[in-house]
């Protein structure tokens, strides 16, 4: 496990995952095929960064957010 920080476009940390197990990037097409309900709920078509911790998957549009690991 490792720590991951989700950063907004200003570089501010909006979420920290202390028990992150995986980070991946899904293209907009992959998101539409695999997780259309997430795009509907968030309301934003974009490539997404997906973090996985003990609570499950967390989705953040890459147009707005970035991720840093440590």
Sequence positions of predicted segments:
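N-terminal acidic leader/helix
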Residues: 2-28
């Amino acid at each position: 496990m490792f720590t991951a920080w989700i950063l907004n476009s200003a570089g501010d940390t909006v979420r920290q995952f202390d028990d992150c197990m995986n980070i991946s990037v899904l293209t907009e097409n992959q998101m539409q095929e695999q997780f259309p309900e997430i795009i509907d709920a968030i309301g934003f078509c974009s490539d997404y960064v997906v973090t996985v911790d003990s609570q499950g998957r967390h989705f953040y549009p890459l147009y707005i957010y970035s991720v840093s690991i440590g």
